[in-house]
Amino acid sequence: MAGGSYKVKIVDVTKLYDQFAYGIKGHSTALRNYFNYVKEFYPNLANVFIIGKGLEFKNYRKDKSKEDLFNLVPTYGIPGSDPLLVCDVNDKQLYALGRLPVTEASEVATYLDKVKEHEYYINNQATEHEKMQWSKRIIHLAGGDPSLYETLESHLDGMKDIIQTNQFGASVKTFHKEQSAIEGNENLTELMDMINEGVSMITFMGHSAQFKLDFNILNPASYQNKGKYHTFLAMGCYAGQIFETYKSISELNNLSSIVFKLAWQYF
């Protein structure tokens, strides 16, 4: 069923500061105290979805205008860690958690349209197995520098063995950074073709920054995978850093109104 028929409670974060953070605007304690309170009185709550960008405190403590523009729902600590917002006193996570780091209502609408489109695409082709083969395909991207190639590829091969032999039954294709450097455009074309045809997940392991991976995946406008959106799992430094005033690579891709991906996870 479209949307999953969840029972949803919408909470305005600005109403929590007085009740759970001693009136301190933008303080992460408000959310943490609130979710611990909710766990006691509403034990069946399972998922938390934060809608709104957050900032690390160091980015706005000397400039309150940044707080108003970007710290719409605060994160916890430095570096920012949303899971700690939903942890108990023993730092045990209470709920599954995600964040859509938007600053404009139009970005929420764009993302919602992509979710609806993706669900409609899957629900209307679920019984046509040939058309759903793309949902069993996974791409692995092995980055890093020469001293790490063997190690990173070994880790990805271990993940490949698991996802191909468990109930998911995936078909995994691995692209290597050193191979891409040798084969150039030919390797990139194969990667683009796979994404355009549809994959369920792309996993990257290598060096990264907030705005870039060390594997060329181009920008969202380069792809034509409309409806066949995937999850991108990035295992690299700062790949998921969304608590700055500028947009990260994950935000640019997830919030794109064009195509490419639906969700970005990082470790």
Regions found by a protein language model. Name each.
Residues 1-267:
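Cysteine-dependent hydrolase recognition
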